[in-house]
Amino acid sequence: MDLGLKDKLAFVSGSTAGIGFAIATALAGEGARVVVNGRTQPAVDAAIAEIRSRMGADAHGFAGDLSLASTAALLFRAHPDVEILVNNFGIFEPKSFEDIADAEWVRFFEANVLSGVRLARLYLPAMRRANWGRIIFISSESAVQIPAEMIHYGMTKTAQLAVSRGLAEAVAGTGITVNSVLPGPTKSRGVDEFVEALARTESKSFEAFEKEFFEKVRPTSLIKRFASPAEVASMVAYLASPLASATTGAAVRVDGGVIKSAF
């Protein structure tokens, strides 16, 4: 199926690895011109080279920390014509509530929420003029099922849903859509590294870890396995396409059924 993304300019924040990289790769595979982002130039260069090698597609890069307003301004000056904005950049860290200082709440909000808000604010005027655009926030199942071990993270993921829905309301009646995507447990590089550490200390295989994880930690999962980054990316690519023109203001789950709700 042709998603109609040929030559559309897409920016994916936090896209040198994991879900973000998979999204950038999927969009490039559909013919979009993709701008990859990471904190360091070597990471960005490596991601660009991998996308070009895999997809035979052109890709560009922007290195910088998008939790900073100054970096968002630099990005906009370098790439002012973005038509598809995917706000994937974010941070997480398990920490007990009593140990989360005020500065940490602010840091998480800056990184996970304001980074996307700033970019949407910068790119929205041109999208309005063109009467076409896509803004997608990569949230999490943690937006709905707040994890007790990282309440500050869950708060930011819920805030993304509010921003996404409110912005969709603000552009009602235009050719711009705004949606959020809620991945569930996903087999990212971080998961791989964690399992490798377990294998060294507990002689536990990935399969054994996965089985135990979904029995004890995410028993409501319907697929009983980690999703792949590519499975999340497929949903994002569709939402970014002209084919998804009737989908806006939605919180779309790619959580493997972890959230135990029909709505």
Outline where the language-model segments fall.
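Active-site helix of classical SDR
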Residues: 120, 156, 164
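Alpha-helical segment proximal to the catalytic Tyr-Lys
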Residues: 125, 169-170, 245
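Short C-terminal tail/terminal secondary-structure segment
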Residues: 145, 236-237, 243, 248-263
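Substrate-binding pocket helix/loop in short-chain dehydrogenase/reductase
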Residues: 96-97, 104-109, 135, 217
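Residue(s) in the substrate-gating loop at a strand-loop-helix junction
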Residues: 140
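Short, small/polar-rich loop/turn modules that mediate ligand/substrate recognition or access, typified
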Residues: 172, 177, 247-249
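Conserved glycine-rich cofactor-binding loop
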Residues: 9, 16-17, 40
